[in-house]
Curated annotation (Swiss-Prot):
Class of the enzyme per the UniProt entry, highest EC level: transferase
Subunit-structure text: Associates with multiple protein complexes. Association with large protein complexes occurs only in the presence of cardiolipin.
Pfam family of the protein (one): Acyltransferase
The organism's place on the tree of life at top rank: Eukaryota
Sequence segments annotated as region (Disordered): 46-112
Protein location: Mitochondrion outer membrane; Mitochondrion inner membrane; Mitochondrion
Motif (HXXXXD motif): 188-193
Protein name: Tafazzin
Organism: Drosophila melanogaster
């Protein structure tokens, strides 16, 4: 077979013969470089890629151009086209742009794109939380009871908690004036802060869907699919979209629950504070308090050791035998302060900031006290 192929290639005018002849001539004329020679050949940097000394450019660093990436060969024709007109975004100045959402006085449309990723559509959750059905309460009772018992076992039996002023929290949950909402605020050191901290409460509270708190949970962590969304929804968690400001359905729903006299728990830091630094509190809690039809009771709390119970590192396993300290502070008496803000018609963005600042001041004192109590246990 090989001889037949070679004889055919030797025929005059054969295309394969002409191609073979060209390849042989190219190899003979050293047009081909063996791989070993190519590897041994010394590397020479291209002239256009060599850096130019900065002394040739007396301007600032921002005015200098990167010659290595913008050098144009002299043989390339110049582009004589006129410059393109400016885009609409370039023609706008800062005075024509709308103010940020946190500084607006009216509730803007929630349909405005925010750039926040939405892994799962949560729009269907809010109507069910706003007007719960009888079926919702039945399922919620099972979920709340299961989570409450689990939290109590983990906190009270598997670890070593110490709660200061526990009766104060229980009294405000069960015996506050009818119709007056309760807003508890605390630091956020662990993903198990809620519901783990509520394991210190009696079973009559922690396993009662009518008495247990409403709480906001991150939409991109807790509400990522239908199953998780159902679980947290029946657990009285409200999906909050972090990064779109205080005017959103989660804050609106908290205000509605406050109008009904319910208990609402807020982590005003807005995230798990793994570094334990003093963060500026988010103003959403200020809006809930200021816009509530009835001024709520504001109860600050501080805890230490929850990040030891459930560390913020993999494999995220609940630990045993850890010391946890929960300190329930004094209720903040802001009634006169809030009434004065409303009487003077202080703009809502300013009012909610002033209220949040009051909570931040209470946090500083409560944190120092709780850290001291926690150190004394060790």
């Amino acid at each position: 077979m090989f001889m037949v192929v070679c004889s055919n290639l030797r025929r005059p005018g054969h295309v394969g013969a002409a191609s073979a002849a060209r390849n042989i001539n190219w190899l003979i004329s050293e047009g081909y470089t063996p791989p070993i020679r190519a590897m041994a050949r010394p590397y020479v940097q291209a002239p256009e890629a060599r850096p130019v000394p900065d002394e040739r450019y007396p301007g600032s660093q921002q005015d200098r151009k990167d010659i290595a990436t913008q050098t144009v060969r002299s043989s390339k024709p110049k582009d004589l086209r006129p410059p393109s007109p400016p885009t609409p975004s370039q023609t706008l100045n800062s005075s024509s742009l709308p103010p940020p959402m946190s500084d607006q006085d009216a509730d803007p449309s929630l349909d405005v794109p925010t750039g926040v990723a939405m892994p799962y559509n949560i729009d269907w959750i809010f109507p069910r939380l706003r007007n719960p059905s009888k079926f919702w309460y039945v399922v919620s009772q099972f979920v709340v009871s299961a989570v409450g018992i689990f939290s109590k076992v983990v906190l009270m039996f598997l670890n070593k908690p110490r709660v200061y002023n526990r009766e104060r929290l229980i009294q405000l949950i069960t015996k506050r004036p009818k119709g007056i909402p309760l807003v508890t605020v605390s630091n956020h050191y662990s993903c198990f802060d809620d519901p783990g901290l509520w394991g210190c409460l009696p079973l009559g509270i922690v396993c009662n869907t009518y008495k247990i708190r409403w709480s906001m949970a991150a939409h991109d962590i807790c509400f990522t699919n239908k199953l998780h969304s159902l679980f947290f929804m029946f657990g009285k968690c409200i999906p909050v979209v972090r990064g779109i400001g205080v005017y959103q359905d989660a804050i609106n729903l908290c205000i509605e629950k406050a109008a009904l006299g319910h208990w609402i728990h807020v982590f005003p830091e807005g995230k798990v504070n793994m570094d334990k630094e003093e963060l500026r509190l988010k103003w959403g809690v200020g809006r809930i308090i200021y816009e509530s039809p009835k001024i709520p009771i504001i109860l600050p709390m501080w805890h230490e050791g929850m990040d030891d119970l459930l560390p913020n590192v993999e494999p995220y396993v609940i630990q045993r035998g850890k010391q946890v300290t929960l300190n329930v502070g004094q209720p903040l008496d802001l009634n006169d302060f809030i009434l004065d803000l409303k009487k003077r018609q202080v703009p809502e963005p300013t009012a909610r900031k002033l209220i949040t600042d009051k909570i931040q001041e209470a946090f500083r004192d409560l944190r120092a006290e709780t850290e001291k109590l926690h150190r004394e246990r060790n």
